[in-house]
């Protein structure tokens, strides 16, 4: 018999109730009691949606900020700087206070989690949220399966203090548990807490618990599997049925995974075909339940239900204990497609957000049982999802005609560099910014007024021009060498281009949580991508008309647009990336023809889109590098910049070099310039590097001395002729009164540095 189950339904609410509750609480507009009551209502709303569609309902899913933070608090891993745990006050201090935990990407998704810091080895069951939530639903007559982040994944994503030497002095740094010894030590310390948790749930009548273990799809060592066996052997002794959920990729070792001592195993059968291949070829244990994640939890497309029913029929031949489910948590999707009334024609019927995915899970089971409504849906979904949609013959022709030369600049870097230096005549240590300037309240208000039709397009454009003029005046007064227009017309670096490109749709209500209460609306790449008209030309050329200094053209790169959007599944990602790249190349050509000499193509998502297993990296980086090269195939005299605002380059430096830009700007302030070592170790590095000398995430105004120290560090390992000076990221979230003195200090520091090395200013 087939059962139905879903997990990870978005907590945001159809009208972003979660966001409003949190932010009103933080602003002091509602009490803690009102916050809790509102969260309980959201929790019940989610549970009722589950009940309408699936038989197995999860609990302990509605975190007040982040599920990894919840687990950190649950096991009592409160760093000493936060003092005694004082309920929600400490909880939110750990999440968003002055000394908050580090925030980083959750695997290769666009969700962010708070990194646990394991200071000591004394842990305890501090807050038993899984038990509280189970009891909450039990009192309402709803039987649930508690969900908990698995101990192995929790440890793999945690950091602990480690003693290292820096310039001959002992220093304590936080590092991942990257050795067998460190992992074993903390497993031993935390396993009793997890056992106590299971005991408490068992005493309340819980007979099944699911542990989320996405770390099992990453590259694992043999000792990792030994530790996993130890964890689940111990936990299974409690006498509660255990399930392990894996997602985002195939499990790294099928044989070891299916032999773990648990009752149920969840497989992502969407991200690739390896899990399914292993299940069919190697079989599946008769005494275990196979949870088949066949409904895509990461992409918003309606399922071809005929294909899914057929797949389940195949799986039933392998396992009689079958559960149909989603491939990964549904919180990567908006709540529902229902209110979307401005999508391109024919698109809405092809979409399925979280609410619709729950219904699809139910329909698959009902179709297997031969129910008429479900069978009609099977037919309808197949008809819609197999029809040709949003194809552009001209885009296809351009793709088909691409050859190797389209992925190469006309001249090698060293020859381009000479030409560009002659044209730009920039001083040593040229100064610039990354692109955006403060988006103040008046900018947001005018954008909203324009979007809602309260002001005309002409009024809005005139307002943007005033802002650009002010930004140019400020930069000239400060003395920056290469200027930017400020990006006042852009609310989001991907959405801005998505709106202007054919083949990409934006939603009105398709909000997804990124972290805490922060939401975004991913664009949807639904068809062949092309550029019907120039996208940035008007603003950039206006800015350039106001100054004799070079103004950078500012584009978001093809890899980032793809990785931060939902994308179609009927063509390979490589092809989508090349389509976007060709559209951007058209923009580059227009900017060049308008006299723009410096063009920046930002790729912040270049690394984060990489597959979770390194064996899959060569294929990904091959098309990622080529997409950038295709978009940036400018004239030799045009200086191409790129920007990457993360600091872990070690593993991908070779791929970064292959991108063949002229200048790359990087974050260097938070790592105090340590990132420079990566470029030092790379033999033959000859590209220019913009050193991010101050942390834009802090309101503090950096001193000349602090910034100079980072530059001096860089000068020890890189030729001074290669170095630029810039902040580490865009200045959109800062205030003008912070930005102006910081940039003034930065420019003054660069001038002093030129004098110190004997160059006339």
Swiss-Prot record:
L-homocysteine binds at residues 434-436, 487, 602. Transmembrane segments: none annotated. The active site is at residue 697. The keyword Methyltransferase applies. It catalyses: 5-methyltetrahydropteroyltri-L-glutamate + L-homocysteine = tetrahydropteroyltri-L-glutamate + L-methionine. HAMAP family: Meth_synth. This is 5-methyltetrahydropteroyltriglutamate--homocysteine methyltransferase. It comes from Aquifex aeolicus (strain VF5). The lineage of its organism: Bacteria, Pseudomonadati, Aquificota, Aquificia, Aquificales. The gene is metE.
């Amino acid at each position: 018999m087939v059962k139905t189950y879903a997990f990870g339904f978005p907590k945001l609410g159809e009208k972003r109730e979660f966001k409003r509750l949190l932010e009103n609480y933080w602003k002091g507009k509602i009490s803690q009691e009102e916050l809790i009551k509102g969260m309980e209502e959201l929790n019940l709303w989610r549970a009722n949606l589950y009940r309408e569609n699936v038989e197995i309902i999860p609990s302990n899913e509605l975190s007040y900020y982040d599920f990894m933070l919840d687990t950190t608090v649950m096991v009592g891993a409160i760093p000493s700087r936060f003092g005694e745990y004082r309920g929600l006050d400490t909880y939110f201090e750990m999440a968003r206070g002055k000394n908050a935990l580090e925030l980083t990407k959750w695997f290769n998704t666009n969700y962010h989690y708070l990194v646990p810091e394991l200071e000591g080895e004394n842990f305890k069951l501090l807050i038993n949220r899984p038990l509280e939530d189970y009891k909450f639903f039990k009192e309402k007559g709803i039987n649930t399966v508690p969900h908990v982040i698995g101990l192995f994944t929790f440890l793999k994503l945690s950091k602990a203090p480690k003693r290292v030497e820096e310039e001959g002095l002992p220093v304590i740094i936080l590092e991942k548990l990257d050795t067998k010894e460190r992992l074993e030590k903390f497993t031993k310390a935390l396993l009793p807490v997890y056992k106590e948790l299971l005991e408490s749930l068992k005493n309340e009548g819980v007979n099944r618990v699911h542990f989320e273990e996405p770390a099992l799809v990453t590259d694992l060592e043999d000792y990792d599997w030994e530790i996993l066996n130890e964890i689940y052997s111990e936990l299974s002794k409690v006498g509660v049925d255990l399930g392990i959920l894996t997602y985002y990729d195939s499990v790294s070792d099928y044989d070891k995974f299916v032999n773990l001592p648990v009752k149920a195993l969840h497989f992502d059968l969407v991200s690739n075909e390896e899990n399914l291949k292993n299940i069919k070829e190697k079989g599946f244990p008769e005494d275990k339940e196979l949870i088949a994640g066949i409904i895509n939890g990461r992409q918003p497309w309606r399922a071809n239900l005929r294909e899914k029913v057929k797949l389940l029929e195949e799986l039933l031949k392998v396992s009689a204990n079958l559960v149909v489910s989603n491939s990964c948590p549904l919180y990567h999707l908006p709540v529902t497609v229902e209110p979307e009334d401005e999508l391109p024609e024919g698109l809405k019927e092809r979409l399925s957000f979280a609410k619709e995915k729950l219904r699809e899970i139910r329909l698959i089971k009902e179709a297997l049982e031969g129910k008429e409504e479900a069978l009609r849906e099977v037919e309808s979904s197949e008809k819609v999802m197999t029809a040709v949609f949003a194809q552009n013959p001209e885009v296809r022709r351009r793709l088909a005609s691409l050859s190797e030369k389209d992925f190469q600049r006309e001249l090698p870097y060293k020859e381009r560099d000479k030409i560009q230096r002659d044209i730009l005549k920039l001083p040593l240590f040229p100064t610039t910014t990354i692109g955006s300037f403060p988006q103040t309240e008046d900018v947001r208000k005018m954008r909203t007024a324009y979007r809602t039709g309260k002001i005309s397009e002409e009024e809005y454009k005139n307002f943007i021009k005033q802002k650009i003029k002010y930004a140019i005046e400020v930069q000239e007064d400060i003395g920056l060498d290469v200027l930017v227009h400020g990006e006042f017309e852009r609310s989001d670096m991907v959405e801005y281009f998505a709106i202007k490109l054919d083949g990409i749709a934006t939603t009105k209500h398709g909000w997804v949580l990124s972290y805490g209460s922060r939401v975004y609306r991913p664009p949807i790449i639904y068809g062949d991508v092309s550029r019907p008209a120039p996208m940035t030309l008007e603003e950039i050329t206006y800015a350039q008309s106001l100054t004799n200094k070079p103004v950078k053209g500012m584009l978001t790169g093809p890899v980032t647009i793809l990785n931060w959007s939902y994308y179609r599944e009927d063509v390979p990602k490589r092809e989508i990336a090349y389509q976007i790249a060709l559209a951007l190349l058209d923009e580059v050509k227009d900017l060049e023809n308008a006299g723009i000499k410096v063009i920046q193509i930002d790729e912040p998502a270049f690394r984060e889109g990489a597959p979770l297993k390194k064996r899959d990296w060569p294929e990904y980086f091959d098309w990622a590098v080529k997409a950038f090269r295709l978009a940036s195939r400018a004239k030799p005299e045009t200086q191409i910049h790129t920007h990457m605002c993360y600091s872990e380059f070690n593993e991908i430096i070779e791929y970064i070099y292959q991108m063949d830009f002229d200048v790359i700007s990087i974050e260097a302030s938070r790592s105090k310039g340590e990132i420079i070592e990566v470029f030092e170790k790379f033999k033959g590095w000859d590209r220019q590097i913009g050193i991010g000398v101050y942390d834009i995430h802090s309101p503090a105004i950096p001193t000349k001395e602090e910034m100079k120290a980072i530059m001096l560090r860089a000068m020890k390992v890189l030729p001074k002729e290669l170095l630029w000076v810039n902040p580490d990221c865009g200045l959109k979230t800062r205030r003008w009164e912070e930005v102006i003195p910081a940039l003034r200090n930065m420019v003054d520091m660069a001038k002093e540095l030129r004098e110190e090395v004997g160059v006339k200013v």
